[in-house]
């Protein structure tokens, strides 16, 4: 199958106007002092209100982690951001804007799933996997840069391809979990670590009390008292 590469953002006429709107709202990043310790709640609430389901938001000691399944942003074998994906990123951008001054770096991490046994040796599959993963993280980074919510030098796009699985690739359910976009928002002064170290913290349950999985506005409302 061919990979669809997104060549430009011109098919999204509202990107620049939205970016200017958010940029005007935050004025200068240096003035943004909202407590980064509460940022995970702001993000989760915003995503719930936007009816985004199954996003995981975690607050660690010096970072905020957010994970989405790939189908939120991209169609299969495509690096073109969907309209739905752009809307989710716009919501995410507005949510992090008030705390932008307290964020040192935003890692945008793209993951794919291993679909064939020879995926790590077949030249065509290697190329497809690496390019697709890299283009997806780049497109998310480009979209966020258009929104003017954080200094562009703080946006770092990273592509892991199939090499950081969190589930079993032998099942469709596992592959769906492995195809994902993650954000690691590092606080000012935080020391970046290997991604696997963060995963170990998540699995240990250390941050269970500061972990939110979004259910969307409709379910969130129905669960109220």
PLM segments and residue spans:
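Periplasmic peptidoglycan-binding/anchoring modules of Gram-negative envelope and division proteins
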Residues: 36-58, 66, 74-110, 141, ...
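Periplasmic OmpA-like peptidoglycan-binding domain that tethers envelope proteins to the cell wall
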Residues: 79-83, 99, 111-199, 219-224
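Juxtamembrane linker/hinge segments adjacent to a transmembrane helix in small membrane proteins
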Residues: 1-75, 191-224
């Amino acid at each position: 199958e061919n990979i669809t590469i997104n060549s430009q953002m011109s098919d999204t006429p509202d990107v620049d106007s939205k970016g200017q709107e958010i940029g005007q709202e935050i004025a200068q990043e240096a003035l943004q002092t909202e407590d980064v310790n509460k940022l995970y709640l702001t993000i989760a609430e915003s995503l719930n209100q936007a009816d985004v389901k199954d996003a995981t938001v975690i607050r660690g000691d010096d970072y905020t982690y957010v994970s989405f399944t790939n189908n939120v942003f991209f169609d299969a074998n495509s690096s073109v951001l969907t309209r739905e994906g752009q809307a989710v990123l716009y919501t995410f951008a507005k949510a992090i804007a008030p705390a932008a001054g307290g964020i040192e770096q935003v890692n945008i991490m793209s993951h794919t799933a291993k679909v064939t046994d020879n995926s790590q040796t077949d030249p065509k599959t290697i190329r497809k996997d690496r390019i697709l993963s890299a283009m997806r993280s780049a497109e998310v980074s480009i979209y966020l840069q258009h929104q003017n919510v954080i200094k562009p030098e703080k946006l770092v796009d990273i592509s892991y391809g199939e090499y950081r699985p969190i589930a079993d690739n032998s099942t469709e359910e596992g592959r769906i979990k492995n195809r994902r976009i993650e954000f690691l928002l590092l606080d000012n002064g935080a020391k970046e670590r290997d991604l696997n170290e963060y995963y170990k913290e998540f699995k240990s349950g250390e941050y269970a009390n500061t972990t939110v999985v979004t259910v969307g506005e409709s379910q969130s409302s129905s669960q109220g008292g």
